[in-house]
């Protein structure tokens, strides 16, 4: 299907050579055409919306389908824009531990002639570590080979102060639990999908204890305390969502 689209855009590009035209390589048009090359002033906006996010795009089946498309477009164009997704759109205030994949994905884009990159990772105040995600992605766009873990430490120390060590532990424990669970991380996920994995009862208790320590560490600094409490919202939201699904089973047990 992308062949017809690109041929149409090429006609426009020929008629208006001083203009640049951008088109989506999205869902049905994601894969590149076999017999047509986009003109230099035709920009390809390639979207990875269907990919799972628990590992880099190169490391799972849904991501590899996107990588195939990216490599195909890269072979015929130097004018590629990637629209990347990095938050949960159905449950935006919920944990989304994808920090460990950011660098490899950005390096992949750079390797394949991507000259523009939009990372849709923030939407509202109170999203899962949204400030840190924006900071890390911004830094990695400037330098894809920067030390990602060092960037996380730098941000946390500056933004959370003495609470930083506990929130770093929180991130790393949840990341490890996600990978160990084998459960995909999807942009239309529900916390309920992870209640036997990274959000199981034992880990939820661990997370709460870490946030309690984080709040205690900055209790005398109103600004830092509010930042920690705001970052706790995704955990609290998950607790409420999971509890909602289990309320009926508790009633059954009591009968």
Question: Which functions belong to the PLM regions below?
Answer:
Residues 140-255:
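Catalytic domains of carbohydrate-active enzymes that cleave complex glycans
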Residues 1-149, 205-208, 212, 216-221, ...:
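Catalytic-core regions of glycoside hydrolase
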């Amino acid at each position: 299907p992308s062949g017809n689209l690109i041929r149409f855009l090429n006609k426009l590009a020929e008629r208006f050579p001083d203009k640049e035209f951008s088109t989506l390589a999205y869902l049905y048009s994601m894969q590149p055409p076999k017999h047509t090359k986009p003109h230099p002033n035709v920009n390809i906006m390639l979207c990875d919306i269907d990919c799972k996010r628990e590992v880099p795009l190169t490391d799972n089946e849904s991501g590899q389908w996107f990588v195939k498309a990216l490599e195909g477009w890269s072979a015929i164009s130097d004018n590629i824009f990637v629209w990347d997704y990095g938050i949960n759109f159905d449950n935006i205030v919920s944990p989304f531990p994808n920090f460990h994949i950011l660098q490899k994905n950005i390096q992949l884009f750079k390797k394949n002639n991507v000259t523009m990159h939009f990372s849709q990772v923030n939407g509202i105040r109170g999203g899962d570590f949204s400030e840190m995600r924006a900071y890390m992605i911004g830094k990695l766009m400037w330098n894809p080979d920067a030390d990602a873990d060092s960037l996380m430490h730098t941000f946390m120390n500056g933004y959370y102060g003495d609470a930083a060590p506990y929130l770093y532990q929180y991130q790393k424990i949840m990341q490890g639990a996600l990978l160990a669970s084998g459960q995909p991380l999807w942009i239309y996920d529900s916390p309920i999908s992870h209640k036997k994995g990274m959000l199981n009862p034992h880990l939820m208790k661990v997370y709460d204890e870490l946030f309690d320590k984080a709040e205690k560490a900055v209790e005398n600094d109103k600004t830092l305390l509010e930042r920690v409490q705001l970052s706790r919202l995704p955990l609290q939201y998950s607790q409420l969502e999971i509890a909602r699904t289990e309320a009926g089973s508790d009633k059954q047990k009591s009968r």
